[in-house]
Amino acid sequence: ACVLCNRVKMKGEVDAMIVGKQSILFEENVYIEETACVAGQKESEGPLGKLFDVVVEDAMAGMENWEEAESTLQQLAVDKLLEKWDGKKEDLRYIFAGDLLGQLIATSFGLMQYEIPMFGLYGACSTFGEALSLAAMTVHAGYAGHVIALASSHFASAEKQFRYPLEYGNQRPPASTWTVTGCGAAVIGTEKGEVCIRGITTGKVIDFGVKDSMNMGACMAPAAADVIAANLEDMQKDVTYYDCIITGDLGAVGKTI
């Protein structure tokens, strides 16, 4: 009887957190305890340049190929994260991480040395949002005290994977988007910090049939619009409720769409 009562209680708590069709609103706040960000030379020249923890001027990061370079970006990010964070590596229960490459090779080789249980994620440009969402759910449910959420990309490895290797010398049209060379990582936990994850809204696969592999902004814009609309509907808010609504870089074309 006690077990049944506990199950009923747990179901009630879960039901209370399920909001609308696509959202969860956590009963207890989950916090971003610390962050680390590594970027390439081109990224450092942009408006966010002064905010990056580490800037890697050598696109090869001292390695022999682009994939190894991306793995190095991940290692630099995790090392900087552990340096900044008050906790210890042994306190980390899981890593939720991913990249843009087949078989997540940058992540698999990049994070192997840390010997932390890892969930490999492939969500393309949504990977970091996916990592934050799953990390927050895991911590809130009590399955971990501290979790790393991480995602990386590299312009050259992504071009090789999805379009044309740089050595091919393909011409890029004006609407083409430029994949970031960098890595972002965060520790998610219950220790109170400046930023909390109050809830999440998970997007759906939205395909408007865009065929141009050079114009990722136009491809992603409908999905971004759909999940923003879902969040506003589920949470019963309007756009004025938020200080900022931030997406990945959709480019001028994607932003207009």
PLM-predicted stretches and their roles:
Residues 122-149, 188, 222:
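Active-site-proximal alpha-helical scaffold in enzymes
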Residues 21, 129-130, 160-196:
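Glycine-/small-residue-rich "gating" segment that lines the acyl/pantetheine channel
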Residues 126, 141-157, 161-168, 173:
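Glycine-rich anion/phosphate-binding loop at the beta-strand->alpha-helix junction
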Residues 6-119, 184-257:
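Conserved "HGTGT" condensation-loop signature of ketosynthase/thiolase-family condensing enzymes
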Residues 66-70, 117-129, 176-178:
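Active-site nucleophile and cofactor-binding loops and adjacent substrate-binding regions
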Residues 98-103, 125-126, 151-157, 203-204:
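Acidic, glycine-rich active-site loops and adjacent beta-strand->loop/helix elements
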Residues 104-110, 130-132, 158-162:
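Short, conserved acidic/polar surface loops in the N-terminal third of protein domains
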